[in-house]
Amino acid sequence: MAVVVIAEKPSVAEDIAKVLGVSKKNDTHWESDDLIITWAVGHLLELKTPEEYDDRLKDWRKSVELLPFIPEKFELKPNSGRGTNRKQLTAIKKLISSKSCTEIVNACDAAREGELIFRRIVEFSKAKVPMSRMWLQSMTPDSIMRAYDGRLDSSSYSKLRDAAVSRAEADWIIGMNGSRIASTFLRTGRNDGTSMSLGRVQTATLALIVDKELEILGHKAEPFWELEVDFKSGNSEWSARWERRNNVEDKDNPLTKAHRITEETEKQELEKLLNSDGKFLTKQQHRDSKENPPLNYDLTSLQREANSMWSWTSKRTLSVAQQLYDTHKLTTYPRTDSRYLPEDMIETIGKTIAQLGAQNHLKSHSQRLTDNGLQNVSRNFNDSKVSDHYAIIPTGKIPQGNLTGDAEKLYDLICRQFLSSFHPPAIWDVQTRVTTKDNHDFKKEVRILKEAGWREVKPKSNSIPEKWNSLDNNPAATEATSHKFKEELTKPTNRLKEAKLLSLMENAGRSIDDEAMAEAMKGKGLGTPATRADTIEKLISRNFIQRARSGSLRATAGGIKLIELLRAIPVEWITSPELTGDMEEKLSSVQNGEFSRQQYMKIIFDKAEEMVTRIKNHDRSELFKDINSIGNCPKCNEQLTETVLSYICPKNEGRGSGCDFVFWKNTSGRWFDRSTAARLLDVKELTDLHGFFNRSGEPYVASVKINDSGTVEFLGGGESTSSSDDDELCECPACERGTIRVNSTMYACDNQECKFRGLSQEMCKRKISVDEAKEIFVEGKSKLLDDFTSKKGRPFSAYLKLDGNRVKFEFPPRKAAAGAKEFPVVAGVVAICPKTKEEIVETPTFYQPSNDGSDCKIQIAREMSSRAISRDEAKQLIEKGEIGPFDDFVSKKTGKNFTSILYLKKNQAVGYKFAKK
């Protein structure tokens, strides 16, 4: 008789086996006389797709009347992944269905997904024996043994199961029905590269990024000045900024900030003040500012800090944190939403702190806590704020020198946060100098560390100028040694980086900096800490958003279009972070037993019905009819109407009939929001307009105008062109009037009227050097360049070639497959390429151009489908474009002969054309 333990992955199973003394290893499990340790490989089972319940649902378009489709009972099937997954599932099913199995122990991750993985396996296997649960908080031997000895009956986790199953079914219902109805009814004529899909958390997260993007695109740059003055008093020197007294700031108007000067009269008054006689007087004030130590990390706060410090993606941080937990056993369970510790862990924490002292770089901090005792105990230890898991902290185990660079950095960050949390606050001396003359103030503030406290562990520099020094008197006579009016333009807010997006997701779209307020929002966010990284990556893979090299995220045209469509229909709940957060809170209530699974699923059924009905029944021509027009047609003066894709004249009847004015919202790499489009119609020209993106996803500015004939015209500028301040490279090959110059991200023409798109300094993750760029512009083509990386992460080589107004990739002849048959080579020309007049010759494996860098694309394999292609046949194929039919080709799949004609396609590749039967 045996107990079967199911872990979530092989490495965890091995750790459990070692601790429990199970030493015999088989292909699919570890075993002893009375204990078997096996493993899943993540999700071995998944929910069946709609067409597996009903054949009619195979055709998405023809089956829309069957939507929303909700199975009476959800059914499982083996995951459509690798064959090894099926083998492992079969093995587990056999083990837990065996008559010798007396108990099944769930040792999968102690969270919703781990519960779901285990419950699905048991349900699919139809096992009927008692079940229990190991709740693993860390992977140290002591923790594993405690979890095994203290395992509880699975019924104790029935609410966790309800929440896990409800989450999976809710995502299936919204995702499957939403994606089908969206693909059928929301597609537009323009291909924007997006994969049309809707999701309960995914779409609300996209809405956050779209709203930020529209805010940025709609920003109108306004001019202002800032006044900086250099002061001197005794041996003290500093710079200070003018600030308006009794200023009333409007948060929606950045020009109302106290230090911004918008009126020429105010600027002139300040100029007069600075040039007049009379001394300035400086008063200095001191105040102490307490900076409390941080809480320990939960997953989201760890991801945010790693993104802020090192620009790591959420996915990267989670991956490294998972390694530290299950591979190295150095930190506790990472997928937690708590930043607190259980009250019964105080003694354990003391031991952990002492153990960390064995590492030289942490020794002094550990010793300080040992000598002085722990601070903030009542704050850090709080049972009411610990849910399934406590905060991410070190286990006390010492690294063995086998950590990667990423793992070492993240481990050190977690250790320092942990030690900091038990230190006293840091006290800063905040010194403020206000220099005054004739009721005008010039302010400067510095912060000097007075009592280090927790900043001993996580240091931060003083913000003190080199010659700050002490004032001789207070107040002190002061002279202005120089001044500068800096002319600036207001800038749009920054695009979201993952640190900020994670915070918004955690708080359902609300920007919350206060820790207590953030804690009150727990459970009301979008998704969970464990799923947020995947949500972001899904949006990127589906081309709804893009991640720039800087790490900032922007909504693509496809993403903006989808959210605008859903709101116009309207299906407001799926684009609302607040409403989605409320649904997430109800899911947490299911897990806590405060809300039933049936109640939650009823909400999901109703939402799915509403979504499908509204999308199916919407009339696209009516979506924007109640929205005010952005302006009049520049050609005929009619009020423009808005569509999903454009601002168009109502007299535009298409096919050249009526007024032909149309202004596409997605134009030249920019989405033209309503306010920007309206401004263009009003003033006729917008110069240095931000919000354009090149094909590499990098931003640039450009100018756009409506010309005398009423046509929208792009003038170039910014990153697609250069200015005379940029370094000169060579003459522009496109317009022959401008000069190619090197700006911050591009090699581009300085002629504002040139249509050349420029060459990005980085293409497919490879830097293009100045010499390589010059060769392209002067010679028309580069040498063969290595080290490009495809979207799938694969390396490749290519030429870069001028093609009209752009630079494109040109790929070298492909190499023969490994093991390809080689033939003797006969010297001489086989044929002449009819397109390029290039000589075609023999190689051991191909008939191809004699010059590797040729424009000719002919490359005929000397053996195709196990049939040798003779020299004469190759000549005929090149000159006539077709040979055959031949009946001695052999299929790779079946091994049987087949008959086919060979022909040259338009791109000069060889294709098969099957003879009519």
Question: What kind of feature is each model-predicted range?
Answer:
Residues 251-295, 670:
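Metal- or metallocofactor-binding catalytic centers and their adjacent structured scaffolds
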